[in-house]
Structure formats: C-alpha cells, structure tokens
C-alpha cells in the first residue's frame, strides 16, 4: 500500500491538470502558430509560470485499490499483485489464466 500522502498528491495533480488543461492547450497552439522569436519567448514564459503539477507529464499511473505505482496495468487500472489476486478470485470478467 502506497503512502496516503502520495495518493493525495496524485489526486491534487489530477485536479490541477484538469483546471489548467484548456489554458495550457491554448498557449501551446499559439506557440505553434507564431513565427516571431520574441512572441515564442513570451509564450514559453507563460507556460513556465503555470504550476508545475498542472503538466500532464508529472502525473503517475497508480493502482486504484492500493496506490502502487509500479507494475501497473492500464487496461484494468490495477497493479500486478492486485490484478493477479482478483483474476484468481474471478473478480475480473473475461480474464482467464493462460495455459499451453
């Protein structure tokens, strides 16, 4: 189980991402369209003034049950440990153990 403060930090980052998403997108579009070097510097400065945690790069995928960040399966939103336990207990529909 991950520390509760780490889980809360990720939740805070997700909220900031959603809050600044449109603003960040608009600035990036302007940055692509402009050709003037001075304007590009100004727009990059605006991006840098935004909170760091509002950047989507800083968020980390975490298991929704335990908060574990490593061994994460995107399709299920679970870490490998929880995925294995739940699949053995038949709690994940359509998941079967392979054998050959």
Curated annotation (Swiss-Prot):
Pfam families: Ribosomal_S14 (PF00253). The keyword Signal does not apply. Keywords: Chloroplast, Plastid, Ribonucleoprotein, Ribosomal protein, RNA-binding, rRNA-binding. Its main location: plastid. GO terms for cellular component: chloroplast; small ribosomal subunit. Part of the 30S ribosomal subunit. Belongs to the universal ribosomal protein uS14 family. Binds 16S rRNA, required for the assembly of 30S particles. This is Small ribosomal subunit protein uS14c. It comes from Porphyra purpurea (Red seaweed).
